UniProtKB/Swiss-Prot annotation:
Low complexity: bias regions: 12-26
Name of the protein this chain belongs to: Conserved oligomeric Golgi complex subunit 6
Top-rank taxon: Eukaryota
UniProt cross-references to InterPro entries, sorted A to Z: COG6, COG6_C, COG6_N
Localization annotation: Golgi apparatus membrane
Topology versus the membrane: Peripheral membrane protein
Disulfide bonds: none
Gene this protein is translated from: cog6
Keywords (A to Z) from UniProt: Golgi apparatus, Membrane, Protein transport, Transport
Main location: Golgi
Length: 716
């Protein structure tokens, strides 16, 4: 590639020719200045960055043109480039001239096309003006033809639809004609005509619509009266137990349902007949054989189990439920649930069972009033609740049977509450029953009540399951106590209000007869432990009543802990030392105590309890107490029913005792250190005597050698 710079010889020769001329001039700069300018020029050229994209593109263009780096080329380069630019611009001008000529020719063609379009548009407008009258006349003729055809079709359809032949009307209204499928087809057609006549009333000819509607109405009334007389005749010989009920009866009932007055008259007649039949059947099941001479002679009447209320009531409810289901199934087959839906069908079943419901209520109330076992009463409550739910689903919650069973459930539960209330009153007047036992265990009447409560909870669990049911159970009466926690009550909570709380209150009130606080606390603890043990396995009982029991036990445990703690202090003799060291206790002082000076540790040596003989006696008492301390402390609460509870209380009391002993030990060591001048300065005990000389020789520690570690080991 040719160099963009001239050869060295050329540059030097050129420089020499140029240099000779100025050298002879007196105005030329010195030689060293010219050489500096040349070096600066070369430096600026050589320092230029040829990595620049513009310079690189320019050099690449020059290289493609095949230009040699000569002085002539460098002089002509600008002129050549400008000449090429001028030539290119001239070429572009020529090309645009050709484009302008083409555009002129296109404009001429477009002008010609516009002229042609204008001529065609004129021809179209003139043709439209000539054909418009013809088209309008043809359209009017076609419209008239269509209207005539429509009127003809309408007349044919009207005659065929609204006019019923006289022979068909005779079949519909005449009493001697049979009620068959043809009768119902004619009836359906007449009803359709009557409904469609309403459309005629809104048209131009109202008179025609009124006449047709009046004629159809007379025919329909006669047909419905014919159906009513026929169904009355059929009801007299109808047997619901017969599975082959006539389909015509079902069809007639569906049709009569369109006339409520006639239909309800039929239902009234039917309900009265069924009420009489079912009442007689219920009385027959109670007192006589189940199915007469053709029945099973091994099946006894329900009255035979009247001595057992639960079985007696259960058998009656089972019979009523079976009869209700059978009656409903028979009525569903008879009416096909199409006349007024499920509600009307349930109402009809209710009316059929009015007499049965009356007899059932009388017998249940008599049985409950003559029975005094609360567990059996509660079982009857659950039985009634079960059947109440069953009949609510079967006949609806507003049905007579569902409301009757709800009333009987409330009545039975009220009788249950009365029995429990009477039992509480009997116990409250029996002073021997309220006397706490010698072993301070739960009183017998409470244990008996808890046995009854256990039976009640098992019954509830068998009926509803172990989980609490949030829906409220039978409403409590005025004789029952108000609920303690209405937010967490469940279906069993009213039972606890009657069967647990009064007996628990009686048991707690009987503790006042005990002579000491310790025996009262143990007695109350045993009562609450027994109740807690009874209700804990049953979530529906513990949900509402375990928390108050636990709170009371927590308070009683604190009292027992204090009793056990005082017993340890008194038996060990440590109480004497603690009482003497009370002024040295690190407790927060009151406002009056802040004015008093804090006693000095050295004053301990002057306390009567810390004199050598007294301290020796206390130490000996402690040594005698420690070997059997834990056993004696446990035996102190032996009448508490729960060994685990006693162990927990004793351990906490021992821990408190050890903390107090640690405090006494620390004060003894501090007093010895004070006496020897350790940790307190140079102060010494000046009050002398024979005893104090002995103390100074061995210190209080020698007279009271036990350590906290030894105490913890011996009491562990």
């Amino acid at each position: 590639m040719a160099s963009y710079f001239p050869p060295n010889g050329v540059i030097s020769s050129h420089g020499s020719t140029r240099a000779s001329s100025p050298a002879s001039s007196p105005l030329s700069p010195p030689v060293h200045q010219r050489s500096n300018a040349l070096s600066n020029r070369l430096t600026s050229v050589l320092s230029a960055s040829y990595a620049d994209s513009d310079i690189r593109d320019a050099l690449e263009t020059l290289s493609l043109r095949g230009i040699h780096n000569t002085a002539e080329v460098r002089r002509q380069l600008r002129l050549d480039v400008q000449k090429e630019v001028v030539d290119s611009n001239a070429e572009i001008v020529r090309d645009f001239g050709l484009v302008a000529e083409q555009l002129k020719r296109i404009g001429t063609v477009i002008t010609n096309l516009n002229q042609t379009c204008d001529e065609m548009r004129k021809h179209i407008v003139s043709a439209r003006q000539e054909t418009t009258p013809v088209l309008e006349e043809a359209s009017a003729l076609m419209k008239q033809r269509k209207e005539a055809e429509t009127k003809q079709e309408l007349l044919e359809a009207f005659t065929q639809h609204f006019i019923v032949p006289d022979e068909d009307l005779l079949i519909l209204t005449h009493a001697e004609e049979p009620i068959d499928d043809h009768f119902f087809e004619i009836l359906a057609r007449v009803k359709q005509v009557y409904r469609d006549c309403e459309a005629l009333l809104g048209g131009e000819n109202e008179r025609l619509g009124l006449e047709l509607m009046e004629k159809s109405s007379r025919s329909l009334n006669s047909a419905y009266q014919k159906l009513y007389r026929w169904i009355q005749k059929e009801f007299r010989s109808l047997n619901l137990e017969d599975p082959r009920i006539s389909s015509s009866i079902r069809r007639v009932l569906r049709v009569l349902a369109e006339r409520p007055s006639l239909f309800h008259s039929c239902l009234d007649f039917f309900a009265e007949a069924r009420d009489y039949v079912l009442s007689d059947a219920f009385h027959y099941a109670l007192t006589d054989a189940v199915s007469g001479t053709t029945g099973d002679t091994n099946v006894k009447p329900i009255e035979f189990s009247a001595h057992d209320p639960l079985r007696y009531i259960g058998d009656m409810l089972a019979w009523v439920h079976s009869t209700t289901v059978s009656e409903r199934e028979a009525l569903e087959a008879l009416f096909e649930v199409s006349f007024d839906g499920q509600k009307a069908l349930s109402d009809l079943v209710n009316r059929d069972l009015i007499g049965v419901s009356r007899a059932l209520r009388q017998r249940v109330e008599l049985v409950i009033q003559g029975h005094d076992d609360p567990v059996t009463c509660y079982k009857v409550v659950n039985l009634l609740s079960f059947y109440q739910t069953t009949f609510s689903k079967l006949l609806g919650p507003q049905s007579n049977l569902a409301e009757l069973l709800e009333t009987l459930e409330k009545f039975t539960f009220k009788h249950f509450e009365t029995l429990m209330h009477d039992e509480v009153n009997n116990i409250s007047t029996d002073h021997s029953a309220l006397t706490p036992p010698a072993d301070l265990s739960a009183p017998q009447f409470l244990q008996d009540a808890l046995e009854v409560l256990t039976s009640l909870m098992k019954t509830h669990e068998a009926s509803y399951g172990a989980d609490p049911i949030p829906t409220p159970g039978p409403k409590t009466t005025s004789s029952s106590p108000p609920p303690k926690d209405t937010n967490s009550e469940n279906k069993f909570t009213p039972v606890l209000h009657s069967a647990l709380e009064p007996f628990l209150d009686l048991a707690k009130s009987s503790a006042a007869d005990l002579p000491s606080h310790t025996t009262q606390t143990i007695y109350l603890t045993n009562i609450h432990l027994t109740v807690r043990t009874t209700i804990t396995p049953y979530p529906f009982a513990s949900t509402t009543h375990l928390s108050p029991i636990q709170t009371a036990l927590s308070t009683l445990r604190t009292d027992l802990l204090d009793i056990q703690y005082r017993y340890l202090l008194t038996s060990s003799g440590l109480q004497t030392l603690l009482a003497a060291l009370e002024p040295f206790s690190p407790q927060q002082p009151t406002s009056t105590d802040q004015q008093k000076p804090k006693p000095n540790i050295s004053d301990i040596l002057t306390l009567p309890a810390f004199q050598p003989q007294a301290l020796i006696n206390i130490s000996q008492q402690l040594d005698d107490f420690l070997p059997s301390a834990l056993m004696d402390a446990t035996d102190n609460l032996k009448r508490v029913a729960s060994a685990t509870f006693v162990k927990s209380v004793t351990e906490d009391a021992v821990e408190a005792f050890c903390r107090d002993f640690e405090f006494v030990e620390g004060m003894v060591i501090a007093a010895d250190n004070e006496a020897r001048g350790v940790d307190v300065g140079e102060k010494a005990v000046e009050e002398g005597g024979e005893d104090e000389e002995g103390v100074e020789k061995g210190g209080l520690r020698r007279l009271f050698p036990r350590t906290t570690g030894e105490i913890r080991v011996l009491l562990s």
